[in-house]
């Protein structure tokens, strides 16, 4: 399998996001990289499903809350930016204050 660097990045984000989902399901609090991966992977999948940028910007704020992450993590993530592929091209999705 010959993947481009962009495809490798997406695969890495997805894998890290899947690991974060499993840890969250076991009741563990997520650390910084896990929280970013979970949200980023969900945004990429949402774009693949055909959601709009505006929908994803809102959706990104609903995925995690303070009780699901380690202390200090929400303050470390003021925003998350993901370059996602939509049916009409690649767009930058920015989620401000993703963990409320």
Curated annotation (Swiss-Prot):
Keywords: Cytoplasm, Hydrolase
Record GO cellular component, one term: cytoplasm
The protein's annotated pathway: Nitrogen metabolism; urea degradation; CO(2) and NH(3) from urea (urease route): step 1/1
A UniProt-annotated Pfam family: Urease_gamma
GO process annotations (BP): urea catabolic process
Enzyme superclass (EC): hydrolase
Lipid metabolism as UniProt keyword: no
Coiled-coil regions listed in the entry: none
Compartments, record wording: Cytoplasm
RNA-binding in keyword set: no
GO MF terms, alphabetically ordered: nickel cation binding; urease activity
UniProt protein name: Urease subunit gamma
Organism, scientific name: Pseudomonas aeruginosa (strain ATCC 15692 / DSM 22644 / CIP 104116 / JCM 14847 / LMG 12228 / 1C / PRS 101 / PAO1)
Taxonomic placement: Bacteria, Pseudomonadati, Pseudomonadota, Gammaproteobacteria, Pseudomonadales
